[in-house]
C-alpha cells in the first residue's frame, strides 16, 4: 500500500513537507504525483520519499485556512499490486496578521485662501468596500475599491487680522477595505500658510439731511471686523469708537443752530484713524 502524510500545521508562506510511504520497499525507483502538482520520488529499495511545497503566502486581505493534497498518479516500483490511498493529507495554515496602514499627506505650503490638498494613501489596493478616512478637520476622504489613494481639497483660512500660520491635520479614523487589520498612521500632515496682505478699508458716513439744531449721526465702518478697539477721530473733534469684533461705530453731533442772519448749508467732516 501507499499512503500520503503532510506537515500538520505551518504558517502562511511556510513549507509543507509531503511524505509518501510504502508498506514494502520499492523494487524500482518510483514517482508519486500529487493533486497540487508536486512529485515525490521514492528510490529503489526505499519505503518513503518526501517533497517540500510552499504554503499559501501571507495575504493582507484574508485569513489563512486549510490546504490538502492527495495522490493522483504513481509510476514505477515494480509492485504486483500497488494500492494508493487517495485520502487527502491536510495541513492547517496558520494566519500571520498583516497590518495595512493608511497615512495622510498634505500640500506643503499655500497662501491664505489657497487650496490645501489632503491625500490619504494605503499600502495595498482597496478591495471589498471603499475605505472611508475621517480627518481631524471634519472632512472625509473615500478611497474607492481598486485604488490605493484619494484626495480632498481644503481652503486655507484668510485672516484679515493675523496673517499666515500653519495647518495641522491628522487621521482620526479609517474603516473599510476588507483588510485583515487596517492601522492608522497618527502622524499629522502639516501645511505652512503664507500671508497675503489683506487691505481693510475705513469709511465715514453721515445723516444725509438734518434741520438746523438737529442731530447728525456719523458712522465709521470697517470692511473687516476690528481685532482690538479702533478709535476714529473726526475733523470736527468728535470721536467714534469701534469695539473689538465690530465693524462699525457711531457718534451723534449737534448740527449748527438756527441763525437769523444766514441760511443753513453743508457740514463736511473728515476722519483720522487711531488704533
Task: Go through the PLM ranges and name each one.
Residues 8-14, 108-114, 208-214:
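Short, solvent-exposed loop/linker segments at the N-terminal edge
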Residues 75-87, 175-187:
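Beta-sandwich strand segments
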Residues 273-275:
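Conserved small/polar residues in nucleotide/adenosyl-binding loops
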Residues 25-29, 125-130, 225-229:
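Extracellular acidic loop/turn motifs
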Residues 57-68, 158-167, 257-268:
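Short glycine/proline/serine/threonine-rich loop/turn segments at secondary-structure transition edges
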Residues 90-97, 191-197:
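Interdomain boundary/hinge segments at the C-termini of tandem beta-sandwich modules
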Residues 41-52, 56, 142-157, 241-249, ...:
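Short proline/glycine- and polar residue-rich coil/turn motifs
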Residues 1-5, 99-105, 198-205:
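Proline-enriched interdomain boundary motifs that mark the N-terminal boundary
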Amino acid at each position: 500500500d501507499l499512503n500520503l502524510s503532510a506537515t500538520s500545521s505551518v504558517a502562511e508562506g511556510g513549507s509543507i513537507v509531503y511524505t509518501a510511504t510504502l508498506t514494502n520497499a520499492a523494487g524500482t525507483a518510483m514517482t508519486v504525483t500529487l493533486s497540487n502538482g508536486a512529485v515525490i520520488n521514492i528510490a529503489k529499495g526505499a519505503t518513503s520519499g518526501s517533497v517540500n511545497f510552499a504554503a499559501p503566502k501571507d495575504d493582507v486581505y484574508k485569513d489563512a485556512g486549510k490546504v490538502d493534497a492527495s495522490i493522483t498518479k504513481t509510476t514505477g516500483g515494480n509492485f504486483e499490486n500497488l494500492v494508493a490511498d487517495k485520502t487527502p493529507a491536510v495541513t492547517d495554515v496558520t494566519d500571520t496578521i498583516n497590518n495595512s496602514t493608511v497615512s495622510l499627506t498634505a500640500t506643503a505650503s499655500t497662501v491664505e485662501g489657497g487650496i490645501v490638498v489632503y491625500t490619504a494613501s494605503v499600502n495595498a489596493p482597496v478591495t471589498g468596500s471603499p475605505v472611508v478616512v475621517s480627518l481631524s478637520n471634519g472632512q472625509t476622504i473615500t478611497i474607492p475599491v481598486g485604488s490605493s489613494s484619494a484626495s480632498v481639497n481644503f481652503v486655507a483660512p484668510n485672516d484679515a487680522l493675523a496673517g499666515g500660520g500653519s495647518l495641522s491635520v491628522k487621521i482620526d479614523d479609517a474603516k473599510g477595505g476588507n483588510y485583515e487589520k487596517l492601522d492608522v498612521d497618527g502622524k499629522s500632515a502639516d501645511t505652512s500658510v503664507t500671508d497675503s496682505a489683506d487691505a481693510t478699508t475705513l469709511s465715514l458716513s453721515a445723516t444725509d439731511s438734518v434741520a438746523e439744531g438737529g442731530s447728525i449721526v456719523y458712522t465709521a465702518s470697517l470692511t473687516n471686523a476690528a481685532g482690538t478697539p479702533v478709535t476714529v477721530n473726526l475733523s470736527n473733534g468728535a470721536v467714534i469708537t469701534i469695539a473689538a469684533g465690530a465693524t462699525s461705530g457711531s457718534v451723534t453731533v449737534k448740527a449748527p443752530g438756527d441763525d437769523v442772519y444766514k441760511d443753513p448749508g453743508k457740514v463736511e467732516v473728515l476722519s483720522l484713524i487711531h488704533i
